[in-house]
Amino acid sequence: MAAFDNPVFNKTLTPVAGAGPNFRATYYTSVTEFTHVCPRSLIDGERLGTSVGKVADPPRFTVDDRTVDMFSHDHGAWPMRMEHWPGTSAERRRDKNALRFHEFHVYDIIEAHETAQSCSAWLHPRFMETLRPSGTVVTLLGMSACGKRVAVHVYGQQPYFYAKKSEIDASIGISTPGELAHAMAASLRSAASRRSTFVEATAESFVIDVVQRRDIYYYESREEEYYRVKSCSAKYISFLCDNFCRGVKKYEGGIDATTRFAVDNELFTFGWYRFKPCAGAIQIRDVTRHSTSANVEVNCTVENLEVIRGRADWPDYKLLSFDIECKAGGANDLAFPTAERIEDVVIQISAVVSSLLTRRVEHEILFSLGTCQLPEDIADHVKVCECGSEFELLLCFMTFLKQFSPEFVTGYNILGFDWGFMYNKMVNIYGMRLDGYGKANAWGTFKVQDMPHSGRGKFRNVKINGIVNFDMFSIIYQKIKLCSYKLNSVAETVLGEKKHDLSYKDLPRLFALGPEERGKIGAYCLQDSRLATKLFFKLVPHMELSAVAQLACITLTRAVFDGQQVRVFTCLLQRARKIGVVLPEKSDRFTFSAHAAGDQDDGGRSVGYQGAKVLDPDVGFHVNPVMVFDFASLYPSIIQSNNLCYSTMTHNPAAIAHLEEGTDYLRVEVQGRVFFFVREHVRRSLLAELLTDWLNMRKALRAQIPLAATEDEKVLLDMQQIAIKVICNSVYGFTGVMNGMLPCLEVAATVTAIGRDMLLKTKQYIEENWREYSNIRERFFPAMAHEGVPQYSVAVIYGDTDSVFVSFKGVPVACLVASGDAMAAEITNALFRRPVKLECEKVFTKLLMIAKKKYIGVIHTGKMMMRGVDMVRKSNCRFVNDTAKALLNLVFYDEDVATAAASSALVDVSALPRGLSKLGARVREAHAALSSPALDVRDFVMTSELSKAPKYYASSKLAHLTVYRKKIARNEEPPQVKDRIEYVIIAPGQRIQGDPFREKETDLVSSLAEDPNWVTAHKLRLNADYYFSALLQTLSVTFNAVFGDAKTAHIVMRSFIPDTLRYPAAVRKILAENTKTLTPM
């Protein structure tokens, strides 16, 4: 073998020479030759360099001091859940009576394409009839109630589409289904040069009937005749939808077979099934005909199946948590490894297997490149599989994945790094086929794709048939707001555990030192898998997303990866099917946006209509109690109460000319455009029906939670009600996405317009009906003791989308808290149609109203709440945050300071109240701290998210981009998109000799940004002036409400640290006066 150390080598090697057990499987069970890549340190002890060569021996690995064949079934390194691996006794024919089962749970559904020719020798005639000449088979993957791993193949699912009969007949001059079948077959055969299978198309390839249906769009739509075109071949349907009679609108042709199977038959995509008795023959497949790694495979039709409603337990599915460690292998082994370079290798993979039923770890395995001696405290619990080359390491892990066959996989950032790195290595470097490494034995989905957002997304879309991936990084990123999403920070925050961290720069040194040091890497690798497992069982994402999958009638994998649009669409499809309504293919008939095709933001969200109204805030420090009223489920309730829907809307005044405005329909005008929605007694809204059913279901689930017998049952019920809430809140957004699956911007625009009107009506009602104390005392405060009329006043000081802030003077907080629900109910009953409901959310005892969507307050329980203010932003450093919070605590919890702050806006800034002296003392303390020589760099670290790839930024003059470029220049681990990049600002003129970063320092602050680790290592000075200015900036924005405006607030805060050299005479005079005022501190 040749030594290799060229860091830019990027050539794809000869594909691995190997094969599966038979023509029906593509996972490897034999390899005769492969490319051997390993670090030179494993051969001759040299730390640098990589050995690359060809090996004509079968791959092997060592476990328990035994060297075993990679594909043997009796090595004992891990359990063999896949019973029929070549050479095992289970591969022989078995007693079919022992294989029978009645009830089974489904966790995933996959699709396959079968032909009559390939199955004629063994497939039962009942199922052969469904393949003419080929067909789609829907396979339900799961586990039987008796513990068997099963695959149930459902034959006979025919994809189809609709088209208006009148339009098809006029387009091609026909009038019957038979004529249409012949025309379609001819169209397919004429395209046979492009698709060879089309040459077999005949009129018998289709089943066409005429049905009564109604288009979902517009009130004037009426039932009429539609052709429903069915075929065994999904390819036929897809081609015809796109190419046959292109001027004729097609309906529902893009619905996949799995969705059709579940929606049309009212079946689950996740949950329990049973076989119906006396519903037709089923067939247990012989082991030689298995197409998956399941231990029992059954053929049936949909008539054989029924769901078991109300059963919520889970079978004993297995969870695999894995993590990989890599190292660079070129001339500079301290560079960050990339999968595209052959010399950068995966050196270890940890695998921790747990039971979802018991939530206990059952097996721990470490796959190691080279020998590895784990520390004694964990060595007895871990199987170590030692491999001689990277290919053998990857193949060993993939063989484990196939043989053990876990249903669920987790890890930390496995979508952003681990899966992508291994996939690129296996496919692009070693030329491996991976389509047999999910549950399917061949031709299964195994995709690792970047999200198509122009470099804006970190997460990859990883879809492996029969394996559901939960990346705990992406789940925590979406659910929990943290300053850092590094695993050690997350573990400390969520689990209360600290991680022993190891820099990737330490890996080359430790790896080259030998088995004992490699054991330290192994312990670190295992630690990450264990923490990911704990995070998984802490947050139980599978519980919530499986509830979403079941409710939305989509697979669990789609619930994880495919966003909100598909969830609402399938629910709407279910409802539409029941009432004879059809959904068009990617409709362009939403006229409100017809003239605004380009009027959208980068995310595809339409901005062609005005957003929710925000009532201008009464900026200031409010010491009178402030009650916050909140509209419960505002947008869903607006859709329900106003009967908004595709099917209730019209732009045509003639369509509602016979109806009475107000009573029979709602007239809406948005930005000069007028449209109408009929009331529910004229036509019921599909969206409103869906929302009503969901919310009733959610209410019932929430009522069951306190009655649940076990904690697991409580968690499941809670996750189910959360799933319903998420989907309900998605309906408004579903209609408002211009490039979505079924857009209707009129609905979204009406929702926001009505929301604005509701805020204004609420404000008007409060200020007119509650203006006089005598009008509300008997209704709301009958027990309040008083003499005469108190100094009472009421004012709406802010309105924010679904909340209204009301200030009460002369009413005790306790009375407001006690009467809040009654006050909200009065407004609801007076103004709104049900189910719109106003609720009393909270009462602030003090409120600092800063600006729109920015406020800080203390609620009646004593807890401080913040929204939109600088000090709770992730980008601020700890020094600024801590100082700002300390000042806030003084303002809210010290009555002297609070009284002074409330009056500050009313007095001349040159004569501030003496009560503010405590603020001045704290600011001086912070200023003095910046002069200390013993500053902790971590207190001054700021972070900014790398929201997209650096090349997509309009300007590179940003602090976090400067640090990004410095890390690249220094061959350090490059931050990935969606990472938060840490940086500090250093004093100018501190260049380190030998620093490979060569950009010149400029006057811009961004050029002074530096990596905190580099600052610590080289003892660089921080920029004290910058940090004090940053503190003043934050305080100015936060306290502008106290002092009238941000400029005045800045002057006041700066006055606590007098510096006559930096200010003009007028400002120096103010500073001098304030210094005298604050002298008694």
Swiss-Prot record:
GO CC terms: host cell nucleus
Source organism, top-level taxon: Viruses
PROSITE patterns: DNA_POLYMERASE_B (PS00116)
An example Gene Ontology molecular-function term: nucleotide binding
Enzyme Commission number, as recorded: 2.7.7.7, 3.1.26.4
Keyword Transferase: yes
Cross-referenced Pfam families: DNA_pol_B, DNA_pol_B_exo1
Subcellular location: Host nucleus
Presence of the UniProt keyword Nuclease in the record: yes
Annotated catalysed reactions: DNA(n) + a 2'-deoxyribonucleoside 5'-triphosphate = DNA(n+1) + diphosphate; Endonucleolytic cleavage to 5'-phosphomonoester
Quaternary context: Forms a complex with the ssDNA-binding protein UL29, the DNA polymerase processivity factor, and the alkaline exonuclease. Interacts with the putative helicase-primase complex subunit UL8; this interaction may coordinate leading and lagging strand DNA synthesis at the replication fork.
Function: Replicates viral genomic DNA. The replication complex is composed of six viral proteins: the DNA polymerase, processivity factor, primase, primase-associated factor, helicase, and ssDNA-binding protein. Additionally, the polymerase contains an intrinsic ribonuclease H (RNase H) activity that specifically degrades RNA/DNA heteroduplexes or duplex DNA substrates in the 5' to 3' direction. Therefore, it can catalyze the excision of the RNA primers that initiate the synthesis of Okazaki fragments at a replication fork during viral DNA replication.
Protein name as it appears in the record: DNA polymerase catalytic subunit
Source species: Psittacid herpesvirus 1 (isolate Amazon parrot/-/97-0001/1997) (PsHV-1)
